[in-house]
A protein has these predicted regions:
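N-terminal export and membrane-targeting signals
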Residues: 1-14
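N-terminal, polar/Ser/Thr-rich
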Residues: 3-5, 18-22, 27-69, 152-155, ...
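Surface-exposed beta-strand/loop patches in extracellular or lumenal glycoproteins
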Residues: 69-92, 172-174, 182-189, 432-435
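Hydrophobic helix-coil surface modules that form long, contiguous segments used
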Residues: 70, 172-315, 344
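A surface-exposed beta-strand-loop module
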Residues: 89-151
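Glycine/proline-rich low-complexity spacer/linker segments in large multi-domain proteins
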Residues: 123, 132-182, 232
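Zinc-dependent metallopeptidase catalytic helix centered on the HExxH motif
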Residues: 177, 301-362
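Amphipathic alpha-helical substructures
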Residues: 357, 390-463
Length: 463
């Protein structure tokens, strides 16, 4: 994510990760899935007792009334015997729920949709949930005061979800640990373009409306989904064999939005050479006119820009496809694994393209006085969800990587980054995982180094 215009931050406590799988003894009666997964910042986000494999979303949106008529079919595997389980959903009127084609009873408890299937679910078995719902999608206000979820625009909606916006428009197991594949059918008035994740399968006009079908075949965290829609010019090109979908609001065309997005092909090649093969089967970006949002987001395969981005923002968001989207955090306090890596990627891109070296960028950060918040609020322990996206996770996070580069040498450092991606592609990680890899590949004990850079509320002086 590009830096927000409001204050935010992140705390990295790898030990706080709780298990997604909670298995009941074989002899026990079917249990109840937990209403949250215990994330240190968002303890009720996500749900226990099952693992989602696929979401099939059918969304029919009318901007004039800001009304969404929708259904979600969720394919999941039970990780314990279940007589009841939850999904995360904000607002809406839920009209019907079925589990394995049988009507299920359901209640609403805050943002929990509590479902009781007619027949209990057995551990290890695949099951299917269909939720039919309608109403006004939710624009979620974050702890830092910024907007996410389904944010209405003049002609549609800008749909971005980090960290907790997706339940504002579809029922989800809203925790980054439970990745799944997705297909979306987004129906909008004719003349409106709807952009989902992955590849465009079809576009069909019918009765004054248009249905856009998208499919993302790589596992994706729920916060990385999108269904942005509005009046856009859509252009399709390629980066090698990878289709790129670029959608731009007409008001942003004169500012060079298409030219900025066209750079994605070269950026993808650069990071593919540096880190490893591009993670996904498609790519692209959306430039909307949504100045009230105030940030860009690395939605998987379709970076979302609230206005025409500068070149460094494009580089930042594309690098997130490796670090953040494919290699994803396990708990939100480890957000520096996303933003620090993407900011360092900006630095190394500049270094290799005639700009400042990464060391020069490090020096600029390090020149900040000891009273600066990046030193007093370390990226591995920033104090709460309201600080998730403050400068420390970006700048001090990136500085941590550059300091590691100097400490272990270029050959070892870039081997660490390549292995980090290769070994964790489509998966979830913690800071502790990265420390172990860095120590193993460098042959050095790095606990004190990472403690100094990530967890101490003071400017590092020796490391």
């Amino acid at each position: 994510m590009a830096r927000r215009h409001v204050v935010r931050a992140a705390v990295s406590v790898a030990a706080a990760a709780t298990s997604l799988i909670v298995a009941a003894p074989a002899s026990a009666a079917p249990g109840v899935g937990s209403p949250g997964l215990g994330d240190p910042y968002f303890p009720l986000a996500g749900n226990g007792g099952y693992d989602v494999r696929h979401y099939s979303l059918d969304l029919d949106y009318v901007r004039a009334t800001n009304h969404l008529d929708a259904s979600a079919v969720i394919t999941a595997r039970a990780t314990q015997d279940l007589r009841r389980f939850d999904l995360d959903l904000r607002g809406f009127t839920v009209s019907r729920v079925t589990v394995n084609l049988l009507p299920a009873t359901f209640t609403r408890e805050g943002q929990e949709l509590v479902i009781t299937p007619r027949v209990p679910l057995r551990r290890g078995k695949t099951f299917f949930v269909k939720v039919e719902y309608r109403g006004e999608p939710t624009e979620v206000i974050d702890p830092d005061g910024s907007s996410e979820g389904w944010v209405p625009t003049a002609d549609g909606a800008f749909v971005v979800n980090e960290p907790q916006g997706s339940p504002g428009w579809f029922p989800a197991n809203d925790n980054p640990r439970d990745k799944a594949t997705y297909d979306m059918a987004i129906t909008v008035p004719k003349g409106i373009t709807a952009i989902g994740n992955g590849r465009l399968l079809s576009r069909r006009d019918h009765g004054g409306r248009t249905t856009w079908r998208w499919y993302e075949d790589s596992p994706m965290a729920s916060y990385l989904t999108t269904a942005t829609n509005g009046v856009f010019e859509l252009r399709i090109s390629k980066a090698g064999r990878i289709p790129l979908y670029h959608a731009v609001d007409p008001t942003e065309v004169p500012d060079g939005a298409f030219e900025r997005l066209a750079a994605e092909a070269e950026v993808i090649k650069f990071f593919s050479d540096l880190y490893g093969q591009y993670p996904f089967s498609s790519g692209g970006g959306v430039v909307d006119h949504a100045p009230e949002v105030g940030y860009a987001l690395e939605s998987q395969t379709k970076s979302q820009y609230d206005s025409t981005p500068d070149p460094s923002t494009v580089v930042h968001e594309i690098s997130h496809q490796w670090f953040g989207d494919s290699v994803s955090l396990t708990v939100w306090p480890d957000i520096w694994l996303n933003e620090g890596f993407a900011t360092f990627s900006e630095w190394i891109y500049d270094e290799k393209h005639g700009g400042p070296t990464a060391q020069a960028s490090f020096d600029q950060v390090y020149a900040r006085p000891a009273t600066n918040s990046i030193w007093t609020r370390p990226p591995g322990n920033v104090g709460g969800p309201q600080f998730l996206f403050t400068g420390t996770v970006y700048d001090r996070g990136a500085a941590t990587l550059q300091a590691l580069r100097v400490k272990v040498g270029d050959k070892t450092f870039f081997r660490i980054l390549r292995e980090w991606y290769a070994h964790n592609r489509d998966g979830n990680v913690t800071t502790a995982d990265f420390v172990r890899l860095a120590e193993r590949r460098s042959g050095q004990r790095l606990g004190a180094f990472f403690d100094t850079w990530l967890y101490q509320p003071a400017k590092p002086t020796t490391w």
